[in-house]
Amino acid sequence: MELENQLSKLHELKNNLKEMGASLCLASLEKKSAELELKMQEAGFWDDVQKAQEVTQEAKRVKDKIDKFKNLNERIDDVEVLKELMEENDEETAKEIISEVKALSKEIDTLKIETILSGEYDRNDAILTLHTGVGGSDANDWTEMLLRMYTRWCEKKGYSLETIDYLPGDEAGVKSVTLKVKGEFAYGYLKAEKGIHRLVRISPFNANGKRQTSFASVEVLPELTSDQDIEINPVDLRIDTYRAGGAGGQHVNKTESAVRITHIPTGIVVQCQNERSQFSNRDTAMGMLKSKLIELKERAHKEKIEDLTGELKDMGWGSQIRSYVFHPYSMVKDHRTNVETSNVNGVMDGDIDNFIIAYLNS
């Protein structure tokens, strides 16, 4: 019975892949790949190293997409041949077919999402910021739990993480943290996480064991590439320096290497303290500011600056995009798509793709 179901699924996957091939415009991709290859062979191509690296990366992305599509088609054909050659009661071949169809289904779903992620910044690296909301020490602890969740998700996706700014809680957890997430489609995927995340649990900080509700916000911005850069008038900036490592002790930097930049016309404030020098911190902070200004420009119809990185106006009741309930029952529910699961431990260990994909498909 399972074999029949998977063979039926195989036919569906073949049709899905055919539709994706049309939407991908495979012929256009192959033409673009050839053009990029010629460009890379031009004299003086490496004169501008940064631009050359971007062209090389784009060429690799285009070729990888073409190769992935062709490989999936070939594997579907191979399964169909295997089915034709399979003898009656051949359990080993049946297991092989079932396993391969399941793998194909997962890979085609991923390709479908990456086809949907066609926005100008979707392929970019991402700047992920977590802020504590309502809930005191519980909320700080909740922010740290979310930090771990996203760290585990990034590890599973093969993305690398770099801490840009980190402010610990007074008693426990994290007040705020900003990370750079490096990897293809990092922004495209993580933009689905923008908003308020709500936790309900028995508080470990309450001696009476009372139930506590905590909130944290997730902001996501694309990191801009050189060809997406924007000019900022220096007179619009106020740049302050301060000592990094606010928790004190041996980690305090004795020089004022941390940088805070305020964009005066909009009131946007960005800061970075984790690079080795004031120059590097300033460079990173400027990149963050440009990303925020780009997103603000794209959402110019919004009236308030809080809308810059999602609906973050009220970090409290009724504003959450997702609820994580640990007590009196176990459930994580996304209020935008109504996708839910009782596997709370799995979610907190980074298994959030079902929420992300459902949102991107909506």
Curated annotation (Swiss-Prot):
GO molecular function annotations of the record: translation release factor activity, codon specific
Protein biosynthesis keyword on record: yes
Keywords attached to this entry: Cytoplasm, Methylation, Protein biosynthesis
Post-translational modifications reported in the UniProt record: Methylated by PrmC. Methylation increases the termination efficiency of RF2.
GO CC list: cytoplasm
Location relative to the cell: Cytoplasm
Coiled-coil stretches noted in the UniProt entry, renumbered to this chain: none
Main location: cytoplasm
Domain of life: Bacteria
Matching InterPro entries: PCRF (IPR005139), Pep_chain_release_fac_I (IPR000352), Pep_chain_release_fac_I_sf (IPR045853), PrfB (IPR004374)
Modified residues annotated as N5-methylglutamine in this record: 250
Function: Peptide chain release factor 2 directs the termination of translation in response to the peptide chain termination codons UGA and UAA.
Family: Belongs to the prokaryotic/mitochondrial release factor family.
HAMAP family: Rel_fac_2 (MF_00094)
Protein name (database record): Peptide chain release factor 2
